[in-house]
């Protein structure tokens, strides 16, 4: 049986080494997030200020996997 994960949206506040980021969730929690393999393979750039979807485990709510970068309304990419 696969573990159930919670999916939240948040804002990248800080970029850390090795594809790790500090993410402030919409509920004001601070989570350490790492980039998923699919995003890493697709060479998707994630920068501070980007909004992302992050998958958080029920058992450790301080870490999560960044699974999607949301498009900014004002950007042209």
UniProtKB/Swiss-Prot annotation:
Keyword Lipoprotein: no
CDD domains found in the cross-reference section: S1_IF1
Entry annotated with the keyword rRNA-binding: yes
Listed GO CC annotations: chloroplast; cytosol
Swiss-Prot/TrEMBL keywords: Chloroplast, Initiation factor, Plastid, Protein biosynthesis, RNA-binding, rRNA-binding
Record-annotated S1-like domain positions: 1-71
NCBIfam families cross-referenced by the UniProt entry: infA (TIGR00008)
UniProt subunit comment: Component of the 30S ribosomal translation pre-initiation complex which assembles on the 30S ribosome in the order IF-2 and IF-3, IF-1 and N-formylmethionyl-tRNA(fMet); mRNA recruitment can occur at any time during PIC assembly.
Family: Belongs to the IF-1 family.
The protein's name: Translation initiation factor IF-1, chloroplastic
Species of provenance: Borago officinalis (Bourrache)
């Amino acid at each position: 049986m696969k573990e159930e994960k919670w999916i939240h949206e948040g804002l990248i506040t800080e970029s850390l080494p090795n594809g790790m980021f500090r993410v402030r969730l919409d509920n004001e929690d601070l989570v350490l997030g790492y980039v998923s393999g699919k995003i890493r393979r697709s060479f998707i750039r994630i920068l501070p200020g980007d909004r992302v979807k992050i998958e958080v485990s029920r058992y450790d709510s301080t870490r999560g996997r960044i699974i999607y970068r949301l498009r900014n309304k004002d950007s042209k990419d």
